[in-house]
Amino acid sequence: MAVVTTKQLLESGVYFGHATRKWNPKMKPYIFTSRNGIHIINLKKTSEEIEKAYQELLNIITSGGKALFLGTKKQIQSAIREEAQRSQQYYVDHRWLGGTLTNFKTILKRIELLHLLHKQEEEGLWKKLPKKEVVQLKRKRDKLEKFLGGIKDMKDLPQAIFVVDPEKESIAVAEARKLGIKVFGIVDTNCDPDLVDYIIPANDDAIRGVKLIIWLMANACVEGTGGVAEKAETFDAKNPLKPQNYNAPNKRPYQDSPRKPSYQNQNQNQI
């Protein structure tokens, strides 16, 4: 039985690509046609690639591996966090810190500090400190939790990383590839498919569609750990269909927000 239906993909709007003038020629095999200056992604290809990604991720998790879910766009942060937690995997839903994978020993030290701060607070040690110092400690803890909370239980590098928009998360993708970590990614028509090992051609601005794919990858992880994957009805209940305005200016259909520039020159030293 297919893990996703064409109807689900149609309803979620994953088939609308970018403007034809912005396309990456390497995405040609995944494009069906163009309409009103917008590329239309081939849903048959999307379905096939989702199946491949699902099975490979399932195999990795079944073999005892772990996955890291990465998506920092504001509209999908909650989905990344909730689905990673549901499937008992790691996640990063805020800015990626340079060196998270390639300089993991340093990241582990920050994680140890985060655990220490939590322990100190739980044991009541902060009650003995001046109020000003407690405020500073809480601020430090909250900042560490924001950027490292999703990987605070990660003792070793993951075997797979699932990325929403590999172009935006280029530093994370480069780190994973350097270390031989399998990269799964939602790739739009303006992206380079060579960045990832398992491509899922889809509109990365279609919020419901992106959530659908995140949900599917989480299901693969749930199955891989011996659990029961959620049914489509559960996803639909959590993400009801909304009417779309196909005539909205300066937007692709199903695009929930305009694109924002990506700032990737940030590093772990800022926390």
Swiss-Prot record:
Residue ranges, compositional bias (Polar residues): 262-271
Pfam families per record: Ribosomal_S2
GO biological process, one term: translation
Gene Ontology, cellular component aspect: cytosolic small ribosomal subunit
Family matches, as InterPro entries: Ribosomal_uS2, Ribosomal_uS2_bac/mit/plastid, Ribosomal_uS2_flav_dom_sf
Molecular function as annotated in GO: structural constituent of ribosome
Keyword Secreted in record: no
Keyword tags: Ribonucleoprotein, Ribosomal protein
Annotated region described as Disordered, given as residue ranges: 235-271
Listed HAMAP family: Ribosomal_uS2_B (MF_00291_B)
Similarity annotation: Belongs to the universal ribosomal protein uS2 family.
Name of the protein: Small ribosomal subunit protein uS2
